[in-house]
Amino acid sequence: MIELFQLDKSLHFPPPAHALTDPPGLLAFGGDLSVNRLLHAYQQGIFPWFSANEPILWWSPDPRGILPLDNFSVSKSLRKFIRKTPLRVTVNRRFDEVIYACAKVKRQSSGTWITDDMINAYIELHRCGGAHSIEVWDDEELVGGLYGVTPGNVFCGESMFHYATNASKLAMFYLVELLRLNGCEFIDCQLQNDHLASLGCIEMPRAEFLNRLKEAVKHPMDQSLWLPRELTQP
């Protein structure tokens, strides 16, 4: 029987290759959600994912869902929407509101993995410059957005939401264009699903993903990309 690794006060994680196959990708439990631990985890392709009644669980799935920016799919109808929409898009204007909205979204599984502890941890990570948000506005009303972590020249997407049709897709479109400005090559989507696949997300063997991540982490992202502002249409 394989025993699950328990984290201690150090920032040490076991190698992702030691993750379980059942449940797939579960690597360790315990530890905390400090800024240093979160950044250390993401730099190694590891992320927390757990429910309110569970200990902190750490994952590194195989295969990994990634979105190569050159593979991002924009349908004709979405392009038309982007050209004509009155919706505005901003970066890092309302991170707190975005993560709270994502936590309220009803998922296929019961409950939410964005617990109060997770919310507080990622808000602190945002304040330290390690997590960022894209917001979509209808006049002054927040109608969509997404957030994620940047452990290097890669964006690790965490969650998205929308109250208006195509609002989350609009946020993704602007995110992709923003990342391209910094020479970023892919978004870490963690796990593949039908919605992400429709946008161009593919599955990649974990070992290959970790090699690409290792290179991306060597090159910090230009923080000027994340200055709070309204984004103009590319």
Curated annotation (Swiss-Prot):
A GO cellular component annotation in the UniProt record: cytoplasm
The keyword Lipid metabolism appears for this protein: no
Subcellular location: Cytoplasm
Superkingdom of source: Bacteria
First-level EC class: transferase
Any Pfam family the entry gives: Leu_Phe_trans
Keyword Zinc-finger belongs to the record: no
One GO molecular-function entry: leucyl-tRNA--protein transferase activity
SUPFAM superfamilies tied to this protein: Acyl-CoA N-acyltransferases (Nat)
GO BP of this protein: protein catabolic process
Keywords: Acyltransferase, Cytoplasm, Transferase
EC number: 2.3.2.6
Database matches in InterPro entries: Acyl_CoA_acyltransferase, Leu/Phe-tRNA_Trfase, Leu/Phe-tRNA_Trfase_C, Leu/Phe-tRNA_Trfase_N
Reaction catalyzed: N-terminal L-lysyl-[protein] + L-leucyl-tRNA(Leu) = N-terminal L-leucyl-L-lysyl-[protein] + tRNA(Leu) + H(+); N-terminal L-arginyl-[protein] + L-leucyl-tRNA(Leu) = N-terminal L-leucyl-L-arginyl-[protein] + tRNA(Leu) + H(+); L-phenylalanyl-tRNA(Phe) + an N-terminal L-alpha-aminoacyl-[protein] = an N-terminal L-phenylalanyl-L-alpha-aminoacyl-[protein] + tRNA(Phe)
Cited function: Functions in the N-end rule pathway of protein degradation where it conjugates Leu, Phe and, less efficiently, Met from aminoacyl-tRNAs to the N-termini of proteins containing an N-terminal arginine or lysine.
NCBIfam families attached to this UniProt entry: aat
Family that this chain belongs to: Belongs to the L/F-transferase family.
Protein name per the record: Leucyl/phenylalanyl-tRNA--protein transferase
Gene it is expressed from: aat
